[in-house]
């Protein structure tokens, strides 16, 4: 009888020990666009997250981080399905999500239905996500699409001498935000945007778009990414297009500059702006690039991290540093973690990042030009660095609010 009792005690101790071990895990859900037009962006986002784990590790005090990855296709519905599955089925406690603009607005709104959890934006860049009715438990450590265009319009006008441009953009919130930033600055300097065309995500035939481009412009701005960007460049070259090109942030990062085929060569000399630049000589950036390169075989990565890899890296870093500050304490609806995340200042690879009162990143922006490294590889070369870019782009908040939210027609081409 005593022997049996001892066995039960031992079994009970084992079960309690197992439960304790299970409680030592902090579960984090991660989403990325691993299907659809932006698949290549999502894949590199995951590389950035993995690079952060390689650099920082997964230990938080005596707890271990456990990650669950879910796929989306850049649509709001797919993002909400993925996040709901991660919460309800996988029982994650923290979300690192999402990647794309419309997804971000949807996940921000969804976050309000789960105030007990913490949501850290992975990479999405629509302005509305944090600027309009922000969620108290949603934190974004990357700038939005308009912030990523700061410096481009002025440089195009003052240095390149461009006076008239046309734009082509994917018809959704992130690219509206990118064009918003470009138009505000270019038109504010005295330039004209004479033609704005919008195409659905996943467009394969750009013939009518190319045919409708005006001839009397100094440059064409491309707010495209992923497969859309490659398809346009191929067809533009075949049509004999010769105009100067300007690019949005995901038009000229390594997701496109490393694409197979000759289409990317049309981008040589393209002026653009982004939250990073491949050739930046800052030691922190160079260290990150090496960590990314060392983490994956050369044929399983880009020559340099894309903007998505950098965003996922920074978001993962913020999460781990925040958790370590509070020793993994998720009590009281994760109140200590949320307070820490709001105050963290990241010494990120692409410059210092801090959050404003809406938990939106204030960071560094880069005006770049696409160059050949002499061996056939294309990179973005720094031509100007702009620090401390906030979400109102330096405008008085009251003036900025009156401009309106980014859309197909907002802002107007005028000086505000």
Q: How should each PLM-predicted stretch be described?
A:
Residues 16-22:
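Sec/Tat signal peptide C-region and signal peptidase I cleavage site
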Residues 78-81, 127-130, 136-240, 279-287, ...:
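Extracellular/periplasmic Venus flytrap/periplasmic-binding protein
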Residues 72, 120-128, 201-202, 242-264, ...:
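Venus flytrap/periplasmic-binding-protein-like
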Residues 29-50, 70-77, 99-102, 168-176, ...:
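Extracytoplasmic "Venus flytrap"
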Residues 25, 40-45, 55, 59-132, ...:
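Beta-alpha junction/loop-to-helix N-cap segments that form part of ligand/metal-binding clefts
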Residues 26, 342-416:
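Solvent-exposed, acidic/polar segments of extracytosolic/periplasmic ligand-binding ectodomains
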Residues 236-314, 323-330, 380-381, 386-415:
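Extracellular/periplasmic periplasmic-binding protein-like sensory domains
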Residues 86, 90-100, 118-122, 164-169, ...:
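Periplasmic-binding protein-like
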């Amino acid at each position: 009888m005593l022997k049996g009792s001892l066995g039960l005690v031992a079994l009970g101790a084992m079960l309690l020990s197992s439960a304790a071990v299970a409680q030592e895990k902090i579960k984090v859900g991660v989403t990325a666009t691993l299907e659809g037009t932006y698949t290549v962006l999502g894949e590199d986002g995951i590389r950035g997250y993995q690079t952060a784990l390689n650099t920082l590790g997964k230990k938080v005090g005596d707890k271990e981080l456990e990650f669950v990855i879910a796929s989306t296709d850049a649509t709001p519905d797919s993002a909400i399905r993925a996040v709901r599955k991660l919460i309800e089925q996988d029982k994650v406690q923290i979300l690192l999500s999402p990647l794309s603009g419309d997804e971000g607005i949807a996940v921000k709104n969804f976050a309000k239905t789960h105030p007990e959890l913490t949501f850290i934006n992975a990479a999405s860049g629509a302005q509305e996500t944090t600027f309009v009715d922000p969620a108290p438990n949603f934190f974004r450590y990357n700038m939005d699409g308009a912030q990523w265009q700061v410096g481009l319009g002025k440089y195009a006008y003052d240095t390149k001498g461009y006076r008239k441009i046309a734009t082509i953009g994917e018809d959704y919130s992130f690219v509206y935000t990118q064009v918003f930033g470009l138009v505000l600055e270019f038109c504010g300097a005295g330039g004209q945007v004479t033609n704005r065309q919008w195409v659905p995500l996943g467009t394969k035939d750009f013939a009518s778009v190319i045919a409708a481009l005006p001839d009397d412009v100094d440059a064409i701005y491309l707010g495209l990414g992923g497969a859309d960007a490659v398809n346009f460049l191929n067809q533009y070259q075949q049509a004999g297009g010769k105009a100067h090109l300007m690019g949005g942030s995901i038009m000229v990062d390594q997701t496109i500059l490393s694409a197979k085929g000759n289409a990317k060569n049309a981008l040589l000399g393209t002026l653009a702006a982004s939250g990073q630049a491949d050739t930046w000589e800052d030691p922190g950036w160079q260290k990150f690039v090496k960590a990314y390169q060392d983490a994956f075989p050369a044929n399983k990565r880009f020559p340099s991290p894309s903007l998505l890899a950098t965003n996922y890296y920074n978001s993962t870093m913020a999460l781990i540093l925040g958790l370590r500050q509070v020793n993994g304490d998720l009590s009281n609806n994760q109140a200590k973690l949320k307070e820490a995340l709001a105050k963290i200042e990241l010494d990120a690879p692409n410059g210092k990042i801090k959050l404003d009162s809406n938990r939106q990143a204030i960071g560094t922006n880069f005006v770049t030009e696409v160059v050949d490294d002499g061996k056939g590889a294309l990179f973005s070369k720094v031509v100007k660095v702009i620090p401390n870019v906030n979400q109102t782009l330096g405008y008085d908040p009251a003036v900025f609010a009156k401009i309106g939210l980014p859309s197909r027609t907002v802002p107007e081409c005028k000086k505000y």
